[in-house]
Amino acid sequence: MTDIIIIGGGPAGVSAALTAKHRNKTVKIISNSAEQSNLWKAKTVENYPGCPNVSGEELLSAFNKQIEDAGIELITGRALNALPMGETFSVSCGQDYYDCKAIILTVGVTQQSTYSGETEFLGKGVSYCATCDGMLYRGKKVAVIGLNEEAASEAELLRSIGCDVEFFDKNRAKKYEICGNDIVTALVADDTLYPVDGVFILRSTIAPNSFLPSLETKDGQIVVDSTMKTSIKGVFAAGDCTGRPYQIAVAVGQGNLAAISASAYIEGK
């Protein structure tokens, strides 16, 4: 059982991980590859103390080196959801599950909005992971809405296990609606109806309230108190996912505070 799992490996996540480690907590970070980060693409970062005119790539590489030197486990992948298990949580990443006592969300800005019917049919025909749920649709018709780099290969995986796949890349349609009664029966893409048994929505990131459905958000941002606690006991958040200002220094400070709060929560149980 890990003490703290951190979702996101940017400035807030790295700061939280190092702080938690220094407080003798076991830590895992689950994060997309650094290359998918908006910070990685920044040519120059001019306002982070001690690192004048550093590129985003250089800064993230330094963060990852510090994580490695501290012996903190970094799992590259997309965290799909977290299931409350009494006083602990089970976090899924691909086909793997990781148990922990507390979660810190440092997922950055989630720019994608959910589609009509997406939340309603999650687990009832809507999935975020072809590898995890593909076999449930063997011999059936599925739609894949591909919004990340791995989407095309995941669509091919579904075909290889016997699914009839209708693939939508990010340019094929602008508007989607998922339809059904108790389960998914169709996808409407730009007013064209496609009868399907399932819809795989493959994004680089997942909206926080899809990851934890009971999590309180406002305008897509996670609501936290002054100690970075969220509406769910044992879940904390830091960085851009909690709202403006979107600054590296702010994210680092919030990550530090979230780890202090998460550590105190664990110690007080």
Describe every region a protein language model picked out:
Residues 13, 110-111, 150-151, 206-207, ...:
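Glycine-rich nucleotide phosphate-binding loop and flanking beta-alpha elements
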Residues 38, 61, 67-85, 90-92, ...:
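A Rossmann-like FAD-binding core segment of flavoenzymes
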Residues 1-5, 74-140, 189, 200, ...:
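FAD-binding core/adjacent interface of flavoenzyme oxidoreductases
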